[in-house]
């Protein structure tokens, strides 16, 4: 196929350079958005009198025909098309003849591709938000069933204080909500229309940019044509938000991997979401969370590549921008697939080992802080109480017993203010229930949080 720009040149492209230069192998993914943008552009050209209404109707009918052909696999790109825009134009001209050549009036591929990518990403952000909500619901259902289930809480991966398992799971719901809020914020800046900026300076024709933007569901237009065709901030913002999503679910994935190990044994992996070893017949491997954890670095890499691509570009459009799409496309797929995999894992891939959890929270010194709090209630300054309990823990370790195993006499030898009620205060259930501050793991506080999230997420289940 002859290039649209070939009249300027005396020689054809080197075949390898033609392939190297082309983006059609990956940007054909934008076919729907390219057709949407072209239909809106044709309507605008008719509204402003640049083409007739009859011509616009014919263009729209032909573009819809191309959409149908693409959906049926009948319209396929060719390497000579260079990109999705030229592929559509080639087919349009083959259908309409000279009329097809009018569509690109007052438009450049520079503003066209920016429009296509924004339309595509806007839809994908909405898709990812749905997957985030589904994962929140899966976490909520696990949390709702485990309000009274206790799990060790850790700092530095050392046992710290016991928690309600529901409280632990709700922490991830909070993270995912921040992710959703960030995506909504990014979407606002994705939803600005560059169409009409043309190559870089605008056009001398009497176009109506606001009309086109409205047709495509954009909330506003770019105020500066140079910025319109050269802005890829939205790809960086999206990939940064996606990186945080992956960070959060990678943390959850890593915990599940630990919990599923024999050393922890907090969860049992089901056959539905596990694989085995080709050599060791006893193995059941947590491949799903491991893959999610591994794919996180892939998204981080895309963020870095986009930042590096943009950092040295003069205004306005540069061919470097062709490299933005694969990074964005793969980020979307990776995030969406990872969220879906984690949701399935929570729904049917793991079961909490309640007996093991109970055994674990009863077999450590994570109730030591509550002994200090008990002494504070007896008017002993906290730092002094802290030091007393440190000595008590050391004594227990030497005797190979737990705090609950100390006799009342031994307690009172430590401090005469300690009474028999100390035993009730340091049971794991009482330790958790005592955390009554807002946002704490106390059962009443967690019950309130569950109710809040039930109201927030209920619409998804309808």
UniProtKB/Swiss-Prot annotation:
GO terms for cellular component: cytosol. HAMAP family: Arg_succ_lyase. One of its GO terms (molecular function) is argininosuccinate lyase activity. The keyword Cell membrane does not apply. It comes from Prochlorococcus marinus (strain SARG / CCMP1375 / SS120). Pathway: Amino-acid biosynthesis; L-arginine biosynthesis; L-arginine from L-ornithine and carbamoyl phosphate: step 3/3. This is Argininosuccinate lyase. Keywords: Amino-acid biosynthesis, Arginine biosynthesis, Cytoplasm, Lyase. InterPro entries: Arg_succ_lyase_C, Argininosuccinate_lyase, Fumarase/histidase_N, Fumarate_lyase_CS, Fumarate_lyase_fam, Fumarate_lyase_N, L-Aspartase-like. Its EC number is 4.3.2.1. The lineage of its organism: Bacteria, Bacillati, Cyanobacteriota, Cyanophyceae, Synechococcales. The gene is argH. It catalyses: 2-(N(omega)-L-arginino)succinate = fumarate + L-arginine.
């Amino acid at each position: 196929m002859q290039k649209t720009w070939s009249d300027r040149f005396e020689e054809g492209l080197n075949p390898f350079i033609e392939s190297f230069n082309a983006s059609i192998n990956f940007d054909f993914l934008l076919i729907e958005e390219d057709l949407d943008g072209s239909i809106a552009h044709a309507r605008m050209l008719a509204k402003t009198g640049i083409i007739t209404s009859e011509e616009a109707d014919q263009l729209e009918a032909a573009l819809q025909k191309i959409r149908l052909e693409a959906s049926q696999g009948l319209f396929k790109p060719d390497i000579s098309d260079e990109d999705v825009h030229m592929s559509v134009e080639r087919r349009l001209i083959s259908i309409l003849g000279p009329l097809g050549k009018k569509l690109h009036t007052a438009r450049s591929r520079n503003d066209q591709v920016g429009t296509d990518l924004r339309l595509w990403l806007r839809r994908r952000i909405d898709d990812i938000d749905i997957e985030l909500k589904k994962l929140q619901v899966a976490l909520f259902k696990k949390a709702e069933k485990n309000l009274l289930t206790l799990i060790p809480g850790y700092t530095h991966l050392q046992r710290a204080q016991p928690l309600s398992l529901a409280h632990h799971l709700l922490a991830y719901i909070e993270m995912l909500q921040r992710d959703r809020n960030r995506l909504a914020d990014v979407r606002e800046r994705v939803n600005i229309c560059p169409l009409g900026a043309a190559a870089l300076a605008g056009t001398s024709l009497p176009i109506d940019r606001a009309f086109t933007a409205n047709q495509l569901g954009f909330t506003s237009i770019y105020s500066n044509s140079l910025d319109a065709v050269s802005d890829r901030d939205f790809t960086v913002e999206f990939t940064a938000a996606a990186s945080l999503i992956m960070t959060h679910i990678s943390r959850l994935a890593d915990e599940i991997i630990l919990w599923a190990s024999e050393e922890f044994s907090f969860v049992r992996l089901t056959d539905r979401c596990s694989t085995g070893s080709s050599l060791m017949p006893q193995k059941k491997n947590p491949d799903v969370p491991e893959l999610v954890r591994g794919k996180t670095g892939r998204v981080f890499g895309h963020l870095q590549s986009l930042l590096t691509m943009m950092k040295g570009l003069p205004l306005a459009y540069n061919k470097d921008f062709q490299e933005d799409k694969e990074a964005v496309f793969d980020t979307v797929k990776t995030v969406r697939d990872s969220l879906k995999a984690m949701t399935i894992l929570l729904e049917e891939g793991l079961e909490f080992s309640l007996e093991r959890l109970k055994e674990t929270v009863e077999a450590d010194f994570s109730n030591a802080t509550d002994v200090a709090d008990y002494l504070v209630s007896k008017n002993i300054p906290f730092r002094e109480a802290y030091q007393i309990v440190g000595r008590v823990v050391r004594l227990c370790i030497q005797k190979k017993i737990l705090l609950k195993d100390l006799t009342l006499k031994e307690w009172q030898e430590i401090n005469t203010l300690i009474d028999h009620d100390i035993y009730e205060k340091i049971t794991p259930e009482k330790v958790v229930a005592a955390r009554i501050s807002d946002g704490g793991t106390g059962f009443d506080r967690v019950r309130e949080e569950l109710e809040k999230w039930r109201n927030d997420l209920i619409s998804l289940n309808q």
